[in-house]
Amino acid sequence: MKIFVASAWPYVNAVPHLGNLIGSVLSADVFARYARLKYGQENVVFVSGSDEHGTPIEVEAKKRNVNPKELTDQAHEYDKKLFLDVWEISYNNYTRTESEIHKTFVRDFMLKLEKYIKIEEDEIPYCEYDKIYLPDRFVKGTCPYCGFEDARGDQCDNCGRLLTPRLLVNPKCVLCGRTPVFKKTKHWFFDLSAFNDKIEEWIKNSQTLPENVKSVALSWVKEGLKPRSITRDNAWGIPAPFEGAEGKTIYVWFEALLGYISATIEYFKKIGKEEEWKKFWFGNDVKSYYFIGKDNIPFHAVILPAMLMASGENYVLPTVIAATEYLLYEGQKFSKSRKIGVWIDEAPQLLDIEYWRFILIRLRPEERDTNFTWREALRIVNTELNDDIGNYANRVLSMVRRYFNGEVPQIKYEKLKDEDTKFISEIKEAPKKMSELFELGKLKAGSEEILKLARNGNSYLNIRAPWNLIKNDKEEAGNVLNIAVNSLRTLSIMLYPLMPKSAEKLYNMLGFKDIEREKWDLAGELVIKSNHKINEVSVLFKKVELNENDINKKLDEIRKNLEKIRPTLLR
């Protein structure tokens, strides 16, 4: 089985915030790390990259009188370093839409769609002040259906209806706030309507697409899919390859979606296995996982599969599109201008990255919008990590060193009590349950199994009380600690996708190396035998004490310093 994993491509005009991170990048990384243990490292490919074309970059470059690529070069390198070096994101390939492989692939792919492309004259919003054609999302106004005053030119976030800039009441340019004019211009349209029935059938038949994804995609289908313009009058982008389309570029959403394929091709070219990419995009032995925010559902659940179908090349359609709801910050939407939220270059200076990774997965908004609060974040660290997991590990390992000189005692199966067999069963089942949830993209729900096992372990110790058993029956105390030590190995493997360094630390304390070589399907087995020597015991997690005033003061200092080092585009 081949597993393709993708996180939505971050747009390079802003540093991602914590909501962006958990919506795509971090979630995809956690799943990819799990998948490598489950299916084997050679069978998993995890890709993404910087989305760098389109109007926002073009506008910024004009303001600064520089080439757009000068801005995106800096921003791409900044984001890449943050993801790979700071946040421990395990991409096989983190690329960019300015990659020559990507640009060539997009142009070639577009020509394969020509059967479903038609040329139409359309009225496009044009800002006379900024002297630029405006993409749908660069026009805002009032929704004609529900009256929502902040609707975008492509969709209303309040009622979910599809829109065009022409439909908006009182449309405004998002760049300057002025009313745009509508100019006639010729564009190339991808006929989505040709795939209305196929998309509907695919969605309804899927056993793995989440309900929130199905709901949004089917609402598009029920309204009737309409042709969508795949060209723009922007200069900064991939030139449209169609005859007569000189001066036009490919709409960024269409080309960014194709980046999932081009990034896979690029990865295998880098490692000298140029044909291997096909194993992750064709055939029945492939599963593909996309981690995105809910605002990107239509593009991944409608437009991407329609393009793949239209190519006529039997590309694998998405297996799971794991779309998160929104993460709020202390009850409010993230806002850079209003200083609401934490951005991914600020967060590492407030808490250890490993803690952040765990916190964000525990707060992952899988079914509804979720509120990040510092009180809850610190509770997760101090109670779930320190008390539930860390304390359990310390209790078990300390007793093995104290009572058995650091050697795992032998298990005597004939002396097992009901509590022992019950906990052994819980150890075996925990990684299976977590795997079932992860396979559906339910990472927060899956992470609950880690805590259940740690809490069950603490309860097991309290019930069996090996510190008392050791006084009269060393063999029975040995049974308890053998089982408990084996549960720590299980915990370390389950914790690894979320907290790779902490999991490796626990694994090392158990006397093992290279947790990445473990196999998920063996995670619940009692493989640690008698006389196995454990290593020195050290503190796995520490409690964090912070109050809101301290956090806000520290954030102000961090932001002042970052303003000096962030790339021009990201300030």
Curated annotation (Swiss-Prot):
SUPFAM superfamilies: Anticodon-binding domain of a subclass of class I aminoacyl-tRNA synthetases (SSF47323), Methionyl-tRNA synthetase (MetRS), Zn-domain (SSF57770), Nucleotidylyl transferase (SSF52374)
InterPro entries: aa-tRNA-synth_I_CS, Anticodon_Met, Met-tRNA_ligase_1, Met-tRNA_synth, Methionyl/Leucyl_tRNA_Synth, MetRS_core, MetRS_Zn, Rossmann-like_a/b/a_fold
Annotated GO CC locations: aminoacyl-tRNA synthetase multienzyme complex; cytosol
GO biological process: methionyl-tRNA aminoacylation
Catalytic activity: tRNA(Met) + L-methionine + ATP = L-methionyl-tRNA(Met) + AMP + diphosphate
Gene3D superfamilies on file: HUPs (3.40.50.620), Isoleucyl-tRNA Synthetase, Domain 1 (1.10.730.10), Methionyl-tRNA synthetase, Zn-domain (2.20.28.20)
EC number from the UniProt entry: 6.1.1.10
UniProt motif ('KMSKS' region) ranges: 333-337
A Pfam entry, by short name: tRNA-synt_1g
Disulfide bonds: none
Enzyme class per UniProt: ligase
Recorded GO MF terms: ATP binding; metal ion binding; methionine-tRNA ligase activity
Ranges in coiled-coil conformation: none
Localisation: Cytoplasm
Cofactor binding mode and count: Binds 1 zinc ion per subunit.
Keyword entries, A-Z: Aminoacyl-tRNA synthetase, ATP-binding, Cytoplasm, Ligase, Metal-binding, Nucleotide-binding, Protein biosynthesis, Zinc
Binding site for Zn(2+): C143, C146, C156, C159
Function of the molecule: Is required not only for elongation of protein synthesis but also for the initiation of all mRNA translation through initiator tRNA(fMet) aminoacylation.
HAMAP family per the UniProt record, alphabetical: Met_tRNA_synth_type1 (MF_00098)
PANTHER family referenced in this protein's UniProt entry, alphabetically: METHIONINE--TRNA LIGASE (PTHR45765), METHIONINE--TRNA LIGASE, CYTOPLASMIC (PTHR45765:SF1)
Official protein name in the record: Methionine--tRNA ligase
Lineage summary: Archaea, Thermoproteota, Thermoprotei, Sulfolobales, Sulfolobaceae
